[in-house]
Amino acid sequence: MDVTRLLLATLLVFLCFFAAYSHLPPEEKLRDDRSLRSNSSVNLLDLPSVSIVALNKKSKKISRKEAEKKRSSKKEASKQKVARPRTPLSVPCVSTRGSCKPPAPACCHPCASCQCRFFRSACSCRVLNVNC
């Protein structure tokens, strides 16, 4: 009785392994170098060829010029943004990320609030809701 159960269990394991292994397509099966060399079904001529094209000096210069134009336009755009001076606020208030310990005035940003940490020893104005 024990021999029969052992034989049936072995047969069941073999059938499960065979069923799982047979569902793999032939390309995904594991192969070593020897089987690849001996197998004639894998033909290297069937693979698409790769063409390598060298860039000439003119195309390199054009791409460099384009890159320089992009860099200069980015620098000009950043200079234009920085050139705008901010109007000073006449109301006494604390800027964002500035220290706002309790005797200090309120935060300048309407959506900012004063948050304190470490038992109110370090306080700063922070914007909690970006979409405010």
From Swiss-Prot:
Which residues lie in Basic and acidic residues bias regions?
64-79
Annotated signal sequence is 1-22
Q: Where does the record place the region Disordered?
A: 61-93
Glycans attached where?
Answer: N39
Cellular compartments annotated: Secreted
Alphabetized, the UniProt keywords read:
Disulfide bond, Glycoprotein, Knottin, Secreted, Signal
One GO cellular component, as annotated:
extracellular space
| Biological process terms in GO annotation | hormone-mediated signaling pathway; melanin biosynthetic process; melanosome organization
Main subcellular localisation: secreted
Can you give the residue ranges of the Agouti domain?
A: 93-132
> What is an example of a GO molecular function annotated in this UniProt entry?
melanocortin receptor binding
Disulfide linkages recorded for this protein, renumbered to the chain, are: C93-C108, C100-C114, C107-C125, C111-C132, C116-C123
Q: Which InterPro entries match?
A: Agouti, Agouti_dom, Agouti_dom_sf
| Superkingdom per UniProt | Eukaryota
UniProt feature coiled coil, ranges: none
Q: What is known of its domains?
A: The presence of a 'disulfide through disulfide knot' structurally defines this protein as a knottin.
Function comment? Involved in the regulation of melanogenesis. The binding of ASP to MC1R precludes alpha-MSH initiated signaling and thus blocks production of cAMP, leading to a down-regulation of eumelanogenesis (brown/black pigment) and thus increasing synthesis of pheomelanin (yellow/red pigment).
User: Per its record, how is this protein called by name?
Assistant: Agouti-signaling protein
Organism name? Callithrix jacchus
**Lineage of producing organism:** Eukaryota, Metazoa, Chordata, Craniata, Vertebrata
Name of encoding gene:
ASIP
